[in-house]
Amino acid sequence: MLKDLNKVRNIGIMAHIDAGKTTTTERILFYTGINRKVGETHDGGATTDWMEQEKERGITITSAAVTCFWNENQINIIDTPGHVDFTVEVERSLRVLDGAVAVFDGKEGVEPQSEQVWRQATKYNVPRICFVNKMDKLGADFYFTVGTIEDRLGAKPLVMQLPIGAEDAFDGVVDLIEMKALTWRGTTEIGTEATVEEIPADLVDRAQEYREKLLETVAESSEELMDRYFGGEELTIPEIKAAIRKMVVNSEVYPVFCGTAYKNKGVQPLLDAVVDYLPSPLDTGEVEGIDVKDPEVTLTRKPSDDEPLSALAFKIAAHPFFGKLTFVRVYSGKVEPGEQVLNSTKGKKERVGKLFQMHANKENPVEIAHAGNIYAFIGLKDTTTGDTLCDPNNPIILESMDFPDPVIQVAIEPKTKSDQEKLGVAIQKLAEEDPTFTVHLDEESGQTVIGGMGELHLDVLVDRMKREFKVEANIGDPQVAYRETIRKPVESLSYTHKKQTGGSGQFAKVIISIEPYAPAQEELEEGESAIYKFENAVTGGRIPKEYIPSVDAGIQDAMQYGYLAGYPLVNVKATLEDGAYHDVDSSEMAFKLAGSQAFKEAVAKAKPVLLEPIMSVEITTPEEYMGEVIGDVNSRRGQISSMEDRAGAKLVKAKVPLSQMFGYVGDLRSKTQGRANYSMVFDSYAEVPTNVAADVIAERNGTA
């Protein structure tokens, strides 16, 4: 356990599904001495893929936190999933990382999920280096991939290595800083060290050209280096590395390395790059939070054991022996087993049981959790994802994480009475672990409805209910998570709630206005939502201050069940303009009911419409099936955004309603003899065409 934070790296490995993330992580663990036998994703032996479903499906679902060492540096790695349905795992891990390795498929370049994960990393200001993997694959093209990093991500790639050979003949890399060739000739066993050679003659000119580009970029990073470089002076290797590191930490450039993790070529230089260029907790610097007593006040904590404790819980996982594991990034201060900490998000004190550093699903006990590191805590009862843990005498709330709403739902019915009880426990445990997994009772049908980020997400959750909690249940067909909103403002709607039933009565009068509300993300204040805004415009104490939050709460209750078909309302601003109260008969409950009813009446007059989730779909297909594929997209109410050439095939980009995409994988296979593939990510909500909306509403209201 290192105390020198300069030698600690908290990094994530992020990529599109199947770009080779988990294999890259496995190789890193082997080379850093943790794994004696290397695990392969395709035979279900990977260390970080430790849930049953991950082993079966060969994809990574849960970010496992793994600690390893390289050249006296400690590297904490979070292996993040690349499948779109698990974006919440990616968001959670990025929030607590200092840097990341973005892995790209050397043939495909930047893929849709790579773009989404890249955007998420940019949102959290995570510095990155890039690894172009699968250089041994048929059709692998390093220069094409670097081009896609620039064109599709709008990033500035800094080429650090050139490949020697490609596809089967990929033998190694040219190191552009040292100007040497590192080769792993032929079939290399795992653990094989690179042979250092002179650069092959046919690559010397190209290497010289790319080194000049690299040095020009380095020179531009400071006036002093620029004067020296363009004055003809040689820059030293330590100077070049220090300048690149500074640019990476500031997210100005993204160094690009290459190799094939599966064939054990290029992994050691990648590890060197993690240490050389990605930031330590000291580079990342102070973490900001807000004062519990006064949310207007910003507090900071330095990454030091001597500061008061501040830490963020970023993941909950169930452990077969210890029960609930809470994965925590400690930003400042230190914690020991048995110590009491404050969960400032919930306002509750928690006692820390045991502390571990995790190696996938194996645990190593530690005596002290130090600043700047990642640990698993045992014994925290009330802490959930996104909560802050801190020193009870110096409370702080760190910026929380925001998670997307589910876009797909299914009804779930337990088969027997005992399954009913087990289902309750299973749902509670899974919802604790995963904030994008939701559950509610459909009041009309009496069914339990669970929601998630896609069909695979819900499949995995239902699978876990069966395996881990032994719940047998019938699962309904997927349903789309529609929303409702309003299209026109309604002004000064008055509603009076009055009840006289012996003794004290109930009285509350409110006058509200509502209007469509869709602010741009950058216009929102900290903690504000784009879904709903409440404004209090009451003057002169016509409604006492203590009743105002009740009106707000009543409106928020009413927003859960929309006017058209009972779907949640979004993008509405409500203003409380005026009202009246009674000294004896008014109460918080009366104002809550008045707010709720006034809002419902206003929505009915505000031209309510139905919204549906639209997915951004990318289909890669051989050219001969283009007509079929495009015709099929059009028949699904899809809109083609663009068509382009992609590595001997055609790439079709489209926006398609989610309701039209169920079962698409089978349809696409049969239309293209299994030669096309697709990926989709959630794009936005859009208004449902009138004729389609009428059917959805009729079906929902039981009048179809």
Curated annotation (Swiss-Prot):
GTP binds at residues 15-22, 79-83, 133-136. Keywords: Cytoplasm, Elongation factor, GTP-binding, Nucleotide-binding, Protein biosynthesis. Residues 6-282 form the tr-type G domain. Its main location: cytoplasm. It comes from the Bacteria. PANTHER family: RIBOSOME-RELEASING FACTOR 2, MITOCHONDRIAL (PTHR43261:SF1), TRANSLATION ELONGATION FACTOR G-RELATED (PTHR43261). This is Elongation factor G. It comes from Corynebacterium efficiens (strain DSM 44549 / YS-314 / AJ 12310 / JCM 11189 / NBRC 100395). The gene is fusA.
